[in-house]
Amino acid sequence: MKKLTWSIGMMAVLVFGLIIPSTFAGSSNDEGYSPEMKAKIEETKKELKKFTDERALTAKHLKTFDELDFVVFTNQEWTRLHESHSKDVKVNWPDGHSTKGIDKHIEDLKAMFVYAPDTNIKVHPVKIGSGEWTSVIGVMAGTFTKPMPIGNGKFIQPTGKKYSINMCTMGHWKDGVMVEEWLFWDNATYMKQLGIGN
């Protein structure tokens, strides 16, 4: 973190201390400087562009993720999941298992709405990222109002209890979509709030 802060600080010093004064003097940005200084200025320009491009890419990914949770997930618009997930996306779930492919991911997401049809994510209190990586904290909420399938034709009957849990999603993005996603939440708290945990 200190290294990143220092690098940004140095870029700012060079940009504002060297480039801008020469601009106000009516000369080109690197006119009158030694070859070494010109090289440093060009290097700083490239670093600054790299930094601003990365920030823009991160902002784009986070905007896509907002749309994913607030609209696509909450409203079960599964035909739009490809806007944020690659066809062969790998998804890592809180219980440790992983799945491959968008169709399987849609199937798993649909299952969450079978017993809690009002499941939703409407807020992202924390959103951070760096280039092709993002991490978002959300609040997932809903009400256990329908029978929960547990296999072999068996069901857990609804308790009518509401749940609201903090969750975190980390995403690795390529070409505008996630190629891998990590989901984190406390399953014990989730079950307890649904009224079926110890």
Positions of predicted regions on the chain:
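Bacterial N-terminal signal peptides
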Residues: 9-19
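C-terminal and inter-domain tail/linker signature
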Residues: 4-6, 22-198
